[in-house]
From Swiss-Prot:
UniProt keyword terms in alphabetical order: ATP-binding, Cell inner membrane, Cell membrane, Membrane, Nucleotide-binding, Phosphate transport, Translocase, Transport
InterPro entries: AAA+_ATPase, ABC_transporter-like_ATP-bd, ABC_transporter-like_CS, P-loop_NTPase, PstB-like
Top-rank taxon: Bacteria
One GO term of the biological process aspect: phosphate ion transmembrane transport
Enzyme nomenclature, EC number: 7.3.2.1
Subcellular localization, as worded in the UniProt entry: Cell inner membrane
Reaction catalysed by this enzyme: phosphate(out) + ATP + H2O = ADP + 2 phosphate(in) + H(+)
PANTHER family for the chain: ABC TRANSPORTER I FAMILY MEMBER 17 (PTHR43423:SF1)
GO cellular component term of the entry, any: plasma membrane
Gene coding for it: pstB2
Organism taxonomic ancestry: Bacteria, Pseudomonadati, Pseudomonadota, Gammaproteobacteria, Vibrionales
Keyword NADP carried by entry: no
Membrane topology: Peripheral membrane protein
Protein name in UniProt: Phosphate import ATP-binding protein PstB 2
Amino acid sequence: MNKFDIENLDLFYGENQALKSINLPIPVRQVTALIGPSGCGKSTLLRCLNRMNDLIEGVKITGKLAMDGEDIYGNIDVADLRIKVGMVFQKPNPFPMSIYENVAYGLRAQGIKDKKTIDEVVERSLRGAALWDEVKDRLKSHAFGLSGGQQQRLCIARTIAMEPDVILMDEPTSALDPIATHKIEELMEELKKNYTIVIVTHSMQQARRISDRTAFFLMGELVEHNDTQVIFSNPQDDRTQGYVNGDFG
């Protein structure tokens, strides 16, 4: 069963075509990794999934991108889409407020005022991000006092507090040390039990470790997608073979 179905998707920045006839199913409650060299289109595609590219002037998109069978570029509420499809960015970006308020912020923005409800969601979200035990005694402390890895897990907690269906991750560990990276990767294994995860990564080793499916992009084209084990052990396209072998990057 697929969470997203992408069919003949083209994206232009003005006259420059950044994505070329992309056809890609993204299965539900699995980790799909998007890999390829810089500028290949993987982050551009990721941002199509919650319409973040709408914020860029001159963008034109054609083709079909459906979530649960509904065209997300049709007549839908984009704010609701971005709640259902949360996003975690490359650099941890906690809000300049307490740990507690970082997670509670989105709930308050939705009009939820009941303290007990907010307390429960904050704890559940921090537990879901494997952060609760590390911060439960300092929830009122400023989020900037956390380590980089903790800040990134706080951003994940902030995302899952909104009860999304999908979590997009754009190189979520590239700014983290190996220990923090390992914790995020362990967390993703747990998160996929409840969420569909799509991750952009420059690390082929990471894609191999954490993903169920992998899609390889090159110069705006989707070269190949398959089970991750197949992509890395028996790719069908010579360009994929060259990339996973490290012949270019």
